[in-house]
């Protein structure tokens, strides 16, 4: 660790503190994530080390690069490339008119490229949210924390006891499904797509049942027709209130027909019918995709 000089604390992630740091030898600025594990006494599980080491192979322009893994005594530090802002801060700080459609389209296209790459390597994210999508002034957006959920699990609370957000969690996870697929990341990205357009979280639930009911109120309560097999899921209840599906023109009014069609395919209840990242990249919505640059604060 003596190779790195901490410059400042930049945040508290799901697993531990994140610092901006400087590599003393090269002068390179990096993000240093200190992973806090419950197993402080036993040291770092070897399975976690193996999982994390595999992530060093994930090289893609839309994936935040894991540069190094430093394992000392019972602590684990992950060294990542540094980007100056996350999408949540950018959305919170952008002017009243919000993010331009051209920039939303560019960001969504890049994120789908990153997802398609990871999914082709059988790596899931499982915890996508605006806070772990990082941007720079060149107009790039990158997925951070890929694969950490598999290595460390997704905790209910962070190490500082903050509740881990449910807002972007796919309905199959909320209904207790133990075996899920790359489709969970597409759902999360669909929620983020809508949020970039409207500047409001699509399903801001404050408990698992509130989260489900917010989804049901918008997309309609699922049944065996809209989602074959839903009634056999562990946490499905036949007593769920029956809501009808809302028209997407009311849910995301600024979006054109192509955008609404893509969003509807990303928010399909049945994960087998949910669009894949690879197919989404060919959607007509991206016919005129360009690469504008954001005005970062």
Curated annotation (Swiss-Prot):
Gene3D superfamilies: Phosphorylase Kinase, domain 1, Transferase(Phosphotransferase) domain 1. Its EC number is 2.7.11.22. Disulfide bonds: none annotated. The modification Phosphotyrosine is found at residue 15. The active site is at 127 (proton acceptor). It catalyses: L-seryl-[protein] + ATP = O-phospho-L-seryl-[protein] + ADP + H(+); L-threonyl-[protein] + ATP = O-phospho-L-threonyl-[protein] + ADP + H(+). The modification Phosphothreonine is found at residues 14, 160. ATP binds at residues 10-18, 33, 81-83, 86, 129-132, 145. Phosphorylation at Thr-14 or Tyr-15 inactivates the enzyme, while phosphorylation at Thr-160 activates it. Activated by spdya. GO terms for biological process: cell division; G1/S transition of mitotic cell cycle; protein phosphorylation; regulation of G2/M transition of mitotic cell cycle; regulation of gene expression; signal transduction. SMART domains: S_TKc. Belongs to the protein kinase superfamily. CMGC Ser/Thr protein kinase family. CDC2/CDKX subfamily. Serine/threonine-protein kinase involved in the control of the cell cycle; essential for meiosis, but dispensable for mitosis. Triggers duplication of centrosomes and DNA. Acts at the G1-S transition to promote the E2F transcriptional program and the initiation of DNA synthesis, and modulates G2 progression; controls the timing of entry into mitosis/meiosis by controlling the subsequent activation of cyclin B/CDK1 by phosphorylation, and coordinates the activation of cyclin B/CDK1 at the centrosome and in the nucleus. Interacts with spdya. This is Cyclin-dependent kinase 2. It comes from Xenopus laevis (African clawed frog). The lineage of its organism: Eukaryota, Metazoa, Chordata, Craniata, Vertebrata. The gene is cdk2.
